[in-house]
Amino acid sequence: FANADEAWQRAAGVGEFAPATQDWAAIEAAAREEGTVTIYSVSSRIAKLVDSFQERYGIEIVGYDIASDLQLEKLRREHNAGVHTVDVLFNSESSILLNEALPAKLVWNFIPESVSDELTESEKSPLLIQRHSSRIVYYNTMLNPNGAPINSLWDMTREEWSGRTLLPSPLEDSLSANFIQTILANPEDMAAAYQREFGEPLSYSEAVIEAVENIATIDKPNASIEWLYRFLQNEPVFQGSTTKIFKNVGDIAQENPPIGITTFSKLRKNKKGVYAAGPIYDLDPIFGVTYPTALMIADMAPNPNAAKLLIRYMMEEGFSPWNEPGDYSARESVEAEQVKEFDLPSFEDLKLWPV
């Protein structure tokens, strides 16, 4: 990563040059002069803001729907080539952001004062969190009227679920990889869940024991490794689209529906008489894996004031495209409204592991 340009930092008012108070009249006036704002967005729903933002501020949003990891690779390459066209990143690849992009000053945090009091410290630093999303397990509610057909992650290793668990390929989908990696990071919980499910301590497969002996970085087998081995032996089906997974699980015109690991907010895709899928809330040991989606200013952004204005907008009324069941606003008041409107548990009441 190239070093950030101090003159730009000073002009943009970021980092150590951020003013003590935010003059929004001045920011808005400067943003209108800039006239456009370019955003790399992990969500295609950014397109829903184009007209309303243009109407309110006279500023054009140029949005690109790009996966989080690819956003950062694109930004890095452009930055190193001296090409600076993007203003805002809307990104959920927290590990790369925290370990690479932020330390290299490739992106800059910005917290609109109007929402600061509604956020926890971890939602303001090191980056501004707009919402909390999750990867969870869905089942077909229409064809399982008595409730979820599984109650443990270990059920996915049973023969009856061979070839019947859908998920995005961890080799192609970074959030799917994060889901698996997070399970791997919690072996004690997985061991306890095994004992609850089968009534006896876990015994490791010979293949796992042999594999671990040949990996210098792993001391000994554990329950998470064993789960992953058995899960992969049970032939899960990798599909490229999280929406496709949801629909394949929820399709009511089938006899033997699969279960699927996909995005919690796909709940909005349910359609009466067509799709009926629901979350497995009481899955043992964990309901799912949660990850934040953050907003930030790109280093050397050509339109830093429009970037600030768009970030504030996406935290306030511009949150509406993401005001869907399963996407929890970081803002306390908005989340409270969501819980009531969507009849969902509060975010803090869900059994979720952070990536």
Identify the meaning behind each predicted range.
Residues 1-30, 208-212:
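N-terminal low-complexity, Pro/Thr/Ser-rich intrinsically disordered segments
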Residues 2, 21-32, 42-60:
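Short, polar/charged alpha-helical segment
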Residues 30-32, 81-84, 128-132, 158-160, ...:
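Extracellular/periplasmic catalytic domains that process cell-envelope and extracellular macromolecules
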Residues 34-37, 58-60, 84-87, 161-165, ...:
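Loop/turn elements at helix/coil->beta-strand transitions in domains of secreted/extracellular proteins
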Residues 40-51, 62-76, 84-250:
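Extracytoplasmic ligand-binding site segments that recognize negatively charged/polar headgroups
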Residues 95-100, 250, 257-278:
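A ligand-binding cleft/hinge motif common to bilobed small-molecule-binding domains
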Residues 117-120, 131-135, 227-231, 274-299:
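Periplasmic-binding protein-like
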Residues 289, 293-354:
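Mature extracytoplasmic/periplasmic domains
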